[in-house]
Structures are given as C-alpha cells and as structure tokens.
Amino acid sequence: PEHGQLAVMAKAVRRAKSKLAGGIELFAICELGLVKSSSATNGMWTLTSSRIIVFYDQLMLDYDRLQFGYEAIKQISRLSSAVDTPELCQVLAGVLASLNSRLIDLRLVKTWFSLHLARLKGSELNLLTDSNGMKLVEGVSYDYDIAEQAFVYLDGGGRYDTETIKLLRLLSANPASILARLKIENETVLTNALYLASLAEQSG
C-alpha cells in the first residue's frame, strides 16, 4: 500500500502450470513480488511471485455484496490516481472484510465506506455544527442543506434525528471492525445515514 497505484504485468498467470496460478484473486489481500521492467515496457513492473494472505470468498456468494465489492474496488482505484495514501488500502480491506460477513448489514458497510471515502476526498460530513456554526444539540432533529453541505436547524424540527447523527459519528470515527458489533433495528436511521453519507461522498 505504501507504493500507491502501480502498473503491473503478470505473464501467463492463468496457465495451470504457472507458478503464479492460484496466487492472484480480485477479492483478496496478496503478498506480491515485483521487479522493475525495462524502459521498453514504459516502466511497468513485472509480477514474479504472489501469495494470497486473506481471501474474501464469502462475499462472492451474495450478489449485492459482490456488486458493491466491485464498486468499492473501482472507486478506490479511481481515487488512488489522485490521492497517495496507504489509508486507501486500509479502507478497501475494511470494506471487503465487512462484506465477507453476511451478519453485517450491507447498508452499514456502504455508509461506513462513503463516510471514509468522503474524508479522503476532502468532503467529510460535518457532524459537529449546523449551517450557522452552532453545535449540533442532542434531542434536536435537523434538515440537511445539500448546497451548504451542512445540517440546518428548523423551529419545527427536521428529518434527521439524534440517533442518525450518533450513528454517523460512530462510523466516521472508527475502523470497519466496529460494524460487526452494531445491530441497528431502526430502518429510518439506517436509510437516512446511508443517504447522508452518500451525499458527502458524491460531493467530493
């Protein structure tokens, strides 16, 4: 992860007798051996060895989890061309590990991913103050202004309650391992948290 995005050439990796066969999987963390190729290959690296450390095979048994796994990899790959940080790898590994456990609600995984991706993009959701700079108060419901990217206080109350904001704060401040300990039964809270996290991620 400390090297960022690399262009790698894997020769004959799908041949049955290849020493690389079975050592590369999309939904896996692998230990790779790489050598710098000649200038004739435009500075690409050549894969010389590969060993699977963790294989997230269970997520492939569920279509929705599989599709989101593809989407997460695509988004991290796209962002890695602009943002150079090992945390991208950490976020992706956390998402894949969570998707691999069918006991974890998929909406929680999506919410966690969107929140952390938004932070890496520089569009982190403001969960401390409202549009007027006032501290968010427990027991008060707020609306959300997409243009200002901030919660808005209304005299009659808003759509997003304290439980939604608490969940977003918890997910924002913790690694993906926290998801295995959460059981959110309030469907509205889950739906609203995912919506707000998605807004933050899309604005980045």
Q: Model-predicted segments: where are they?
A:
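Non-catalytic alpha-helical scaffolds and adjoining flexible linkers that form interface surfaces
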Residues: 2-204
